[in-house]
Amino acid sequence: MVRPQNVHWFIATIVFFIGFVHANTESILYKVPHNFPLKKPRDSSTYARDVNLISSISLSGEAMSQITIEANTTDLELHNTTYIELADLQRDETYQIKVCWSAIHPISINNLQTITIPRFTEFQGTKSDYARILVTFQVLSDSYPSEHAMVPIQVSLITTRLGIPVDIYPTLIVMVLLVAGLVVTRAPHVLNDLLLKF
């Protein structure tokens, strides 16, 4: 038989390690201003040197989109900032920007934020005739020497509804169904116990 004290230690250990599991995900919420000049479908970007200088995530008709980039974590590339353009956003909407990486890669994500690039402004070798929203972050290696030079990082752009990111909805639905199932299956027993007390 398991002793209650052992169960308490087991639960305490799990709660302690949850902080480490959460360490490989960083996220922020961003609300597009109501007067932000959105790109029209006929608008196009003009690039000074290379089309692929800035990666982008597009939400055209989707509630969630993601891309995988590879970040260089060698000592020459430390403190190098990654830029990703957020495309096809809607005014006055809130989005969650989530950066995830595998826990086997000892890295940290710092300075996760959004920036706005005004129209006709050259930025990282690109220029556009519309204002752009970019997410930026720095990848830092937590081990020396770096065990993996190129680390895959997944960046997700998720629409929020009622203040909740839509990727969490399936989990919430399952939890509500489980609780409802427990209530339905336990209700006759609880009602019977209450009637027996009277």
From Swiss-Prot:
Residues 24-163 are lumenal. Residues 1-23 form the signal peptide. Its main location: endoplasmic reticulum. The keyword S-adenosyl-L-methionine does not apply. It is a single-pass membrane protein. GO terms for cellular component: endoplasmic reticulum membrane; glycosylphosphatidylinositol-mannosyltransferase II complex; mannosyltransferase complex; nuclear envelope. It is found in: Endoplasmic reticulum membrane. One of its GO terms (biological process) is fungal-type cell wall organization. Part of the GPI mannosyltransferase 2 complex composed of GPI18 and PGA1. Essential component of the GPI mannosyltransferase 2 complex. Responsible for the transfer of the second mannose to the glycosylphosphatidylinositol during GPI precursor assembly. Present with 6940 molecules/cell in log phase SD medium. This is GPI mannosyltransferase 2 subunit PGA1. The gene is PGA1.
